[in-house]
Amino acid sequence: ITEELLKEMKDIPEGMFDESQERLNEFFKGMFDEETGADLTIITNAQMEAFKLIFTEVERLAAEYISKLFNHEVIASENTYEQKKYEFENFGHQFYCYLDIYFEDQDSIKIFEVKSTTSKKYDDFKITLEGEEFPLFLKNRDNIYEYVGDELIGTVAGKKVITQKMVEKKHDALFNKFSKVGKYIYDLAVEKYIVENSRINANDEFKDVEYYLVVLNSEYHFSGRYDENGKPIYDLDENGNALFKIYDLSDIVEEYFFKIDDECNRILENLKYLTINTHMLGECCEYKKTTQCKFCNICMKKVLRDGSILEFMKKNYAFSEETPDGKRDRLTVYELINRRYYTIDQCRDFLTKNDNIMQYECYVNNKVYIDKERIKLALKEIRYPIFHLDFESYNCPLPRFKGERPYEQSLFQYSLHVENRPGECDLVANHYEFLAKDHHDRRLELTEQLIHDIDLKNGGCVMVYNKSFEKTRLHELAAFFPKYKKELDNINEHVFDLLEVLNGSSALYDDILNTKLKE
C-alpha cells in the first residue's frame, strides 16, 4: 500500500465498498501521518540497532562452539541468504526460513536457532516444593539441556509430592508464545513447521530432524583473556561454564506442530478475505516491548492520547467487574479497550485498588493527595551533605571485561552533585563526574574516583531515584574490587531512595478511601 494508491482509492465511486472494506480503507489510511505522510508502521529500536553487530558476533561464536562440541562442520553465515534455506508453497503463498546453524550427519539433521538472550529464564524454570527447587531442564552427558517435566511427577519433597497438575502448569507455559520461556520455543516451532512441510513436498523424509535452541549462559563469567588483536577469548570460565547453553527442544516443537498448522490456516483465511476485527487488541500487540507490533500506532490510535487508560499504574491488577454472584472477575486493560473504554475518566466502575482510585481522582477531579507525615519522616532521614548520584551503564550481550556475565550492567559513567546545605548546590562548582575515555576497562578508575568524590567522613546521604539499580552496581563493584569493599559498602549503607517517598504508601491510600466514604 502506498500513498499514491490511497489517493486513487479516494476516487472510487461511492457505495462500491461494503462496511468491512471501508474499515480496510480507513485502516490503511491510518498507516500514514496526515500532516507529514510518514509511515507510522516503521518503528526502530535504538538499542536493537546498536546491538546488531554484536548479535551477528553471537551467532558466529555459537557456530564455532557447536562445530567444536559436535565435532562436525556446520552451515552458518553472517549473510542470511547464505544460510541453509527451507521453503514450501501453500495456496499460492510462499513459506520459507533461513537457519542460523545447520548440519547433517549419517543419522540425522540438526538445526540450531540462536537467540541473543540469556539462559536465566530457563535456569529459573523450576518447580519449588517444601523449599526445594526442581529444574525442568537438566543437562545430559553431552552438555545439552533436556526437558524433564514428566520425570519429576511423583518426586517427594518433605511431606509433599510433585503432581501431574504441577508439571502440566509449567508445561503449558512452554506453549505460550508471549511468555518468557515460550516466545523462543515458538520461533523454533515455526521453523520446524516450514522445514517439515518443505521435506514432505520434496519427498525428503529419510532422516530424523533435531531442533535446538542456543542462548547465552547467564552463569558464565568472562575470564578477561584477549587475543593478539584485543578481542575477547570466550573459553570455559573457572567454574567450567561455556558461553552458551544448548536446549534440545525436538519433542516440545513436535507437540507444537498442529498448533502452528492451525495458526497458519487462520492467517491464510484472513489474507483471503482481508477482514479487519475492530476488537482485536490484546497481549499479542506486545505494547511497549521491543517486539511491539508495528501496527500499534494505527490500531491503538483512539487510546494513545492524554489521559489514556494505558496510563493507569499496575494495569495487570487494576481492573475488575462485579459478577451476578457478587464476586469480581479481573479484566485486562485490553478487554476494556476492546469494549471502547479508552480513557481514565471512563473507568471508575472497574477500579477497586487504592492506588488506581487515587489516580482516577487526581485526573478526573483534580484532587491532590500529599502524605505530609511521610514527607516529614523522609526529611528526618536526609543528612547533609547530600550526594545526588546517577550511574550510566552498558549491558553488552557479550561480556567485555573480566568477571562480567552476558548483559551485565557495565558502569562507564557517573554524575554527582553535592548539596552541602539546603539549596546550596552550584551547577559547576559542586558537580563531579567520571566518564570512561575509551572502550577499555575503566571500572577500577571509576571506583577509586567515586570513593574519593563521595566523602562520608562527616556524614551525609547518597540520594538516588530507584535504589535497586545503584545499590546492585555498588555491590558488583565491591565483588570486583575486594580491597574497596568497605568503602563501597559504606556508600551503599547511606543510600536514600527518593522513589520510596514519591511512590505513596498504604496508609495514604487508606486515608483517601476513608475521606471518600465521609464525603
Segments predicted by a language model, with ranges:
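Metal-dependent nuclease catalytic cores that hydrolyze phosphodiester bonds in DNA/RNA
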Residues: I1-I111, T117-T155, K315-V368
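Cys/His-rich finger/ribbon microdomains and the adjacent scaffold used
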Residues: L5-N25, G30, E35, T44, ...
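Intrinsically disordered, low-complexity acidic Ser/Thr-rich regulatory segments
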Residues: E26-E57, T155-L188, D248, I252-I260
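Conserved RNase H-like, two-metal-ion catalytic cores of nucleic-acid enzymes
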Residues: E59, A63-F70, I111-E113, T118, ...
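Conserved DEDDh/DEDDy metal-dependent 3′-5′ exonuclease domain
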Residues: E78-Q83, D100, I111-S116, D172-F175, ...
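Two-metal-ion RNase H-like nuclease active-site motif
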Residues: N79-Y86, P385-N395, D497
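Active-site-proximal helix-loop-helix substrate-binding element of RNase H-like nuclease domains
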Residues: K120-M166, Y211-V215, Y220-F258, L498-E519
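A short acidic (Asp/Glu
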Residues: D123, F222-Y226, P397-K402, K471-F480
